[in-house]
Every structure is written in C-alpha cells, then in structure tokens.
Amino acid sequence: MAHHDPINLMTPPAGLAQLNERSREIFRQIVESYLATGEPVGSRNISRLIAVPLSPASVRNVMADLEQLGLIYAPHTSAGRLPTEAGLRFFVDALMQVGDMTEAERQSIQSQLAAVGRAQSVEAALDEALTRLSGLTRAAAVVLTAKSNTRLKHIEFVRLEPEQALVVLVGEDGQVENRVLTLPPGVPSSALTEASNFLNARIRGRTLAEARLELETALAQDRAELDQLTQKVIAAGVASWSGGDSDDRQLIVRGHANLLEDLHALDDLERVRRLFDDLETKRGVVDLLGRAESAEGVRIFIGSENKLFSLSGSSTIVSPYSDATGRIVGVLGVIGPTRLNYARVIPTVDYAARLLSRLMGG
C-alpha cells in the first residue's frame, strides 16, 4: 500500500493534537464535502451529515474553533466554510483513510503496460502509463525521466541532407533519442561511418555524461588516427548531446483536458490557464518533480507547497520509479486541483510507479 511522509513545508496549525472527536468529525465533513463538490458547506448541512446529533449553533461554535486553528476559512462569497491548504495537509496526513484500487483498475493498468512492455519500448510504456493514470484519476498525468542516466548501447549517423544528419542514440533500456546535427561542408559518407565506429567502440554501457568525458579524452589522444572531417563530425555529435540541464530530463504530460472538467468559477479557469502555461514551459515542474526523486514512496505537494511554480490551488502527487539496478530513473504522478480524490489517487500513483519499475526490471 502507498505510504506518504508528511511534508512540513508549511507550519502546521498549533493545537491539532487537542482536536476532540467531535471537532475532527465536523472537520472531516467539511473536507469531504469540498473534495466531492468544490463548494463551501454550512453548519446546517453539517449538522444533518454528522453521526452525532448537534444543533447548527453547536456546529458553528466548533467551526469557529477550526477557523481559529487555521484549518478552515470562509470565502467572501459564502456563509459556508472551505478547508485551507494547511487543513488539507492535516486531513491527508492524519485523518484520511487511503483507499485501494479495484481489481478492474489494477488490470486496466497492468494489461496495457504488459502489452507495450513486450514491445520493448520505454517511451511507449511511459506514454501508456500516463494515459491510464490520467484516465483513472481524472487529472493530468506527468512523468519526468532522467535521460542522462540512460546507459548507451549504440549510436548512428543518418544523412538527411548534404550538410545535415540525424544522430540516433539508443539506450540499453530501449530508449531512442534523435537529434538533428549540422555537418561541416564536404563530409563524405565514409566519415559518418568512421565517426559511428569510433563512438560505438567507446560509449557502450556509459551514460551520456560519462560518454562525453571519455570522448573528449579519446579525441585528444587519437586525433592523428582520425580524418579531420571525422573529428569534426564526432565533436559536433558530442556537442549535440550536451544541450544543458533541461535536455537531460524529459517531461511528458497527458490528460490536460481533465483539468478543464468541473470548473466552478472564473478564478478556477485562471488557475488552470496558469497551470497549462507552467506545464507548457516546464517552468518549475521539473524542479518540483526532481524533489521527489530522493524520496521513497508517494510524495504529496498541496497548493502553495508547490512553491517552485504557480500551482497554488493545485496539488501534485508523485512517486519515483526505478530501473533494473534499483536506481531511480524518473518520477511519475498527477497534477490536479487541490480537491483531488487523494484517497483514490495516492494508491493509483503508487501502483503505476511500482508496475513501471517492474517493467524496467527494477
């Protein structure tokens, strides 16, 4: 079952431990009503919902205490109450019962991943995992892959035009990456073949970072043995791999449209528009997901805990996945409104990440 460590990025309200059972029950009803409808809930409705018979006036007194603790607040448009982000964090960490996936849901992910896994394409497996995850959680599914950790198996240069070639990098995990390369004038096909042979003799089993270091040394030592144009092809090929940190990681997003469902107000629409913009530009998303790579199990970032980009009003639930050596090679999860169905989403993300690890031999 999924586990999740409390992430104390915000100061927990004082006195939570002193909440009595009646206060917890009223608070739970406010949160569960919010997660179900997105709407504030008033004392009259709560007095009908709770198991213990209490008058609306008594409920209002408890709500005033909860508000004092920073767990709920009154939006200016309503007499009802909504949970604060700190309240949601308290609910997720202390009160929520994490559910379990149905057998049908497990099979839905497992059968599809097994099918693409047989095709030996990591990218296809990631894509399928995201499609299933976004479908089951009704949120946007995201994966961050650490491409720089992929160990190389093979490289090939394919000429596209007289002064342009495609560099095809194949990883040991089956991942394929293509980059377009500008060639020096007058490069013959023999130079492309020689460059491929030179590189393949030295890069197999190395990560991109290791291969770059190895090749810089090898080029300096073996310069006399190589044709000048071949040297230029190799140098250009190595340069094309080192396109900066953003190229070392790949962010894939599926299920954007889920974020447009069930919007309640213009401010919801504005929040989703900002989120789309962040996902499109990768602004902060890569950093946020990267923080989950160092943790075991599911990590949950609620609202403004997503300090790295403008995700207030949104939550992120992510889990790392591993390769055959047990090394974490990426992070899988979902991004959605703060009123995500946490009890359902947490085990789903956990299961998908475990399946992906198994598929990759982890």
From Swiss-Prot:
One Pfam match: HrcA
**Superkingdom of this protein's organism:** Bacteria
A single MF term (Gene Ontology): DNA binding
Q: Does the keyword rRNA-binding apply?
A: no
GO annotations under biological process? negative regulation of DNA-templated transcription
| Keyword field | Repressor, Stress response, Transcription, Transcription regulation
Presence of the UniProt keyword Transcription in the record:
yes
HAMAP family per record: HrcA (MF_00081)
**Main role?**
Negative regulator of class I heat shock genes (grpE-dnaK-dnaJ and groELS operons). Prevents heat-shock induction of these operons.
Q: Which family does it belong to?
A: Belongs to the HrcA family.
Name of this chain's protein? Heat-inducible transcription repressor HrcA
> What organism is listed for this UniProt entry?
Bradyrhizobium sp. (strain ORS 278)
